[in-house]
């Protein structure tokens, strides 16, 4: 179970995850998958569509491959009978109506238990354009969706996956936190942003994978904790 605590200034600490919990087991599989994702992704992506290149691949292509390889990873660990990975539909009627209008608001992927209970929500975003703030907010903005409870409303923990297509992890860490800082100083924002929204210093998992953490206040629900996995696709160009 996730446990949420606060320090004496009211800033939430990142929640601990019990070592042998279901969520911990799922996160281990997700991380194992992402460690080998860049090479495996390109191999299967080109087999599926030989018109794809590093310049025309989009977010949906990456998320489709991630869903496929996560399913294979759960099977490799003999867990495919316990968990399923699938794209998600809009999480409520309001989102469904937005989808009909062409506004994509559903979470990208979810890991569910055998009884259908959602264990983990995963939102995938490209990090490819220093002027594209969709990782933080916008028409399909990532972090803001969690803060507004459009994504993962019933969860206390979720993941974002950033597909880095240019620049370095350090560049994007600085850029994303800059975008968040700008939201903190924006007058009239419909959702509240503060220092807890800032991403922690990236922790290296491999040459091609880092992880950051953040905590986000929400409209009504308790704060949600996010682990941000950034996977480098730069060397595939």
What are the language-model segments listed below?
Residues 1-56, 70-76, 133-136, 149-157, ...:
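C-terminal tail/extension regions appended to the core domain(s) of diverse proteins
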Residues 35, 61-67, 138-145:
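Well-ordered, non-membrane alpha-helical segments in soluble/globular domains
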Residues 82-117:
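Active-site metal-binding core of divalent-cation-utilizing nuclease and nuclease-like domains
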Residues 109-111, 120-128, 146:
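Conserved catalytic cores of phosphodiester-cleaving nucleases, focusing on short active-site segments
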Residues 120, 129-141:
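Active-site-adjacent loop/helix micro-motif of nuclease/hydrolase catalytic cores
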Residues 123, 160-164:
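Conserved beta-strand segments of the P-loop GTPase G domain that flank and frequently precede/overlap
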């Amino acid at each position: 179970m996730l446990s949420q605590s606060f320090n004496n200034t009211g800033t939430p600490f990142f929640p601990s995850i019990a070592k042998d919990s279901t969520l911990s087991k799922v996160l281990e599989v997700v991380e194992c998958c992402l460690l080998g994702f860049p090479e495996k992704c390109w191999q299967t992506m080109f087999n599926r569509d030989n018109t794809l290149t590093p310049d025309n691949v989009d977010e949906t292509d990456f998320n489709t491959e991630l869903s496929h390889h996560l399913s294979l990873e759960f099977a490799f660990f003999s867990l495919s009978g316990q968990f399923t990975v699938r794209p998600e539909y809009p999480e409520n009627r309001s989102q469904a109506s937005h989808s009909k209008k062409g506004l994509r608001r559903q979470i990208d992927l979810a890991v569910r238990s055998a009884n259908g209970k959602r264990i983990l929500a995963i939102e995938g975003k490209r990090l490819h354009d220093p002027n594209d703030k969709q990782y933080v907010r916008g028409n399909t903005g990532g972090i803001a969706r969690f803060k507004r409870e459009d994504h993962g409303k019933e969860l206390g923990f979720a993941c974002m996956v950033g597909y880095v297509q240019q620049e370095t992890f350090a560049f994007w860490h600085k850029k994303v936190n800059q975008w968040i800082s700008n939201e903190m100083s924006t007058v009239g924002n419909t959702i509240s942003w503060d220092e807890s929204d800032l991403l922690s210093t990236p922790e290296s998992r491999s040459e091609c994978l880092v992880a950051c953490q953040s905590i986000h206040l929400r409209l009504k629900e308790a704060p949600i904790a996010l682990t941000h996995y950034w996977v480098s696709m730069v060397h595939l160009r």
